[in-house]
């Protein structure tokens, strides 16, 4: 709309255009409406989990608590019992919103590789799919998460890939990002701390992992294994990938068991 482009045929936009609101001096009639926000942070969405249905005036929190945000921006007084009709209306909107989205929950968001315009794809552990929480920040990665002391670990996460073209692919796996210049088994020295309520991730020591080898696991099968030497920064595998869906889960063999490779770079040779 802002660029003058036409809408793709059959495409349904979600929401309402704010283009008119962006015009200098515009006076736009803007009807009150409901919006939904939630914070799931789980693999499979849970109804009403950490949710809020919002209007200009009202906030319905977790489907149970109602606050008048204009008079009570701190959300201290729950008015649900005094405004049952408002709660009912906002719950009905959420139910409709959930019903529209629920059929998509079983769909996996896949990372595309093999596209002619993107011959190199970089992956990080943030996109692992697994039952337990993924190591999504440097605090996790520096501390070898999700390994636990005294417990033999097995790498249970995977990257969901959609291979667009059958062929031979180069898969480079790393413990540290390539920009670090660090070897797989090398400790990462802490950086300077920054002001804040807690210790910055960069101020933590990046632990050595004592990896003996790296293994390429694809669709639950271990295909190749290579030794990790003291100076090795990355391990490179070459393998044939067929067009379609795949689960990629390379790992390092460490004293505690299996530690997923936090970084991978996939390219066509």
Labelled PLM ranges:
Residues 167-169, 210-214, 260-262:
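Short beta-strand/loop motifs in extracellular/secreted proteins, especially
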Residues 141-163, 179, 234-237:
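Short beta-strands within extracellular/lumenal beta-sheet-rich domains
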Residues 3, 69, 83-154, 168-170, ...:
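Catalytic cores of secreted or luminal carbohydrate-active enzymes
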Residues 240-244:
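Surface-exposed, short loops/turns at beta-strand junctions within beta-sandwich domains
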Residues 163-206, 248, 252:
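A short beta-strand element within beta-rich, extracytoplasmic domains
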Residues 1, 54-85, 89-90, 125-131, ...:
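A short aromatic-rich beta-strand->coil structural motif
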Residues 253-269:
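Exposed low-complexity, polar/acidic, P/S/T/G-rich flexible segments that act as propeptides
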Residues 1-71, 86-89, 104, 116-117, ...:
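C-terminal cap/loop subdomain of S1 sulfatases and analogous C-terminal strand-loop tails that border
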